[in-house]
């Protein structure tokens, strides 16, 4: 996607489980914008230090320079200089990319909407579901408000089927359902699975209301 089919500012969201290529797709889109000589700003949560502290990195090894910030308010401050409301596009910015969007709090929603309303193309990548297969943070509202949504799948390394869920592992076994939601990790802590075998100890992560 070089030039978006949407005129003016808008919001694009790329979601999926771990290992589905979300960061890879974010890097691809932003790199194409850079090739087109568009002005791009990239942000990532400071909590994500798995590969590079100051780069967005895919599991395949592709990277793109980024600013690590603790929260959405820090992104606002970086763009406005004073953390004020963004009634106009930030000077020198055409496209803004944010990786691991699920780690930012609810303050991310009004920020990206302000940016889009101000004429900026905003591209987010993140997990739509946590390891319990429940909606992750503010991602549901971001998905609902986006002009463009792409849901990617990974590949289950057990059966080879398209994987839509993220299973957290502790000592090679599924994590407990009541374990903390946020745990930054990669292949040592997570695997991608299809719906059917996705479970967490202490509870089924995708309970069906028809089961009772």
Swiss-Prot record:
It is an enzyme of class 2 (transferase). It comes from the Bacteria. It is found in: Cytoplasm. Signal peptide: none annotated. GO terms for cellular component: cytosol. ATP binds at residues 16-23, 99-102. GO terms for biological process: DNA biosynthetic process; thymidine metabolic process. GO terms for molecular function: ATP binding; thymidine kinase activity. The active site is at 100 (proton acceptor). It catalyses: thymidine + ATP = dTMP + ADP + H(+). Its EC number is 2.7.1.21. Keywords: ATP-binding, Cytoplasm, DNA synthesis, Kinase, Nucleotide-binding, Transferase. Pfam families: TK. Transmembrane segments: none annotated. NCBIfam families: PRK04296.1-1. Belongs to the thymidine kinase family. Homotetramer. This is Thymidine kinase. It comes from Deinococcus radiodurans (strain ATCC 13939 / DSM 20539 / JCM 16871 / CCUG 27074 / LMG 4051 / NBRC 15346 / NCIMB 9279 / VKM B-1422 / R1).
């Amino acid at each position: 996607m070089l030039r978006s089919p949407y005129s003016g500012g808008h919001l694009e969201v790329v979601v999926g489980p771990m290992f589905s290529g979300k960061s890879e797709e974010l890097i691809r889109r932003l790199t194409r914008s850079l090739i087109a000589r568009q002005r791009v700003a990239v942000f990532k949560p400071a909590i994500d230090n798995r590969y590079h502290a100051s780069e967005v990195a895919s599991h395949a090894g592709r990277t793109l320079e980024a600013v690590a910030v603790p929260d959405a308010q820090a992104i606002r401050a970086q763009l406005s200089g004073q953390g004020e409301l963004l009634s106009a596009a930030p000077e020198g910015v055409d496209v803004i990319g944010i990786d691991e969007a699920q780690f930012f709090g609810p303050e991310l929603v009004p920020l990206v909407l302000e940016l889009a309303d101000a004429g900026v193309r905003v591209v987010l990548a993140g997990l739509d579901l946590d390891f319990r297969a429940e909606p992750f943070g503010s991602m549901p509202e971001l998905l609902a408000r986006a002009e463009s949504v792409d849901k990617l799948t990974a590949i289950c390394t057990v059966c080879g089927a398209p994987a839509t869920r993220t299973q957290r592992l502790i000592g090679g076994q599924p994590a407990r359902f009541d374990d903390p939601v946020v745990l930054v990790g990669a292949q040592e802590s997570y695997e991608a699975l299809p719906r059917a075998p996705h479970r967490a100890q202490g509870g089924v992560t995708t309970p069906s209301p028809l089961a009772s």
